[in-house]
Amino acid sequence: MPPLFISLEGIDGSGKSTQTARLVDWLRVRGRDPLQTREPGGSEGAEEIRRLLVEGDPDRWSAETEILLFTAARRDHLERTIRPALASGRDVVTDRFADSTRVYQGATRGALRGLVDRIHAEAIEAEPDLTLILDMDPELALSRGLARDSGEDRFEDFGLPFQQKLRAGFQALAREYPDRCHIVDASADPDAIAHTIQTIVGQRLAEA
């Protein structure tokens, strides 16, 4: 059975990190050897770039600069972590991948989706086999304040209107890529969310 490349996406505070860890545990119990990773980050170089991106003033970088930084981090992540794991037969489960850049920088910060897609085509080219979009009311997500516990709150500081645009952007991506993107109700109980995700992934494994 070939390995799966799975990404979890969604607005800030939607519970992606928790559900990424639960999915990895579920796959491991079923005898698979998943690698859990995240973006920006997932490799030594990408983690260094992460600190530049997620900390500090909201206006620290222009949208164009963010696109280049995220892509540089993603390329290092892909070369040093994702591709080697997949080549060795391991599933990869990542908390965010290229869809986040499509939405955060491409759709909400100056309509730069075309630039994002051109750079992605040249430098990345890879897409997950399966993307799970955790969807919830941005007001509820912001009230959780998950990023603030770590100091990685730069994008939360853009406020509610920005998060509402993000939600709409992720919903639009699900319509654009229906074969790989699945929307999951992230306002449900964490156990119910995990069950929904496991059902979707289980179906994909059965098809492999």
UniProtKB/Swiss-Prot annotation:
It holds the Pfam family Thymidylate_kin. CDD domains: TMPK. The keyword Kinase applies. The keyword Transferase applies. GO terms for cellular component: cytosol. ATP binds at G10, I11, D12, G13, S14, G15, K16, S17. It catalyses: dTMP + ATP = dTDP + ADP. Its EC number is 2.7.4.9. SUPFAM superfamilies: P-loop containing nucleoside triphosphate hydrolases. GO terms for molecular function: ATP binding; dTMP kinase activity. One of its GO terms (biological process) is dUDP biosynthetic process. It is an enzyme of class 2 (transferase). Keywords: ATP-binding, Kinase, Nucleotide biosynthesis, Nucleotide-binding, Transferase. InterPro entries: P-loop_NTPase, Thymidylate_kin-like_dom, Thymidylate_kin_CS, Thymidylate_kinase. PROSITE patterns: THYMIDYLATE_KINASE. NCBIfam families: DTMP_kinase (TIGR00041). Phosphorylation of dTMP to form dTDP in both de novo and salvage pathways of dTTP synthesis. Belongs to the thymidylate kinase family. This is Thymidylate kinase.
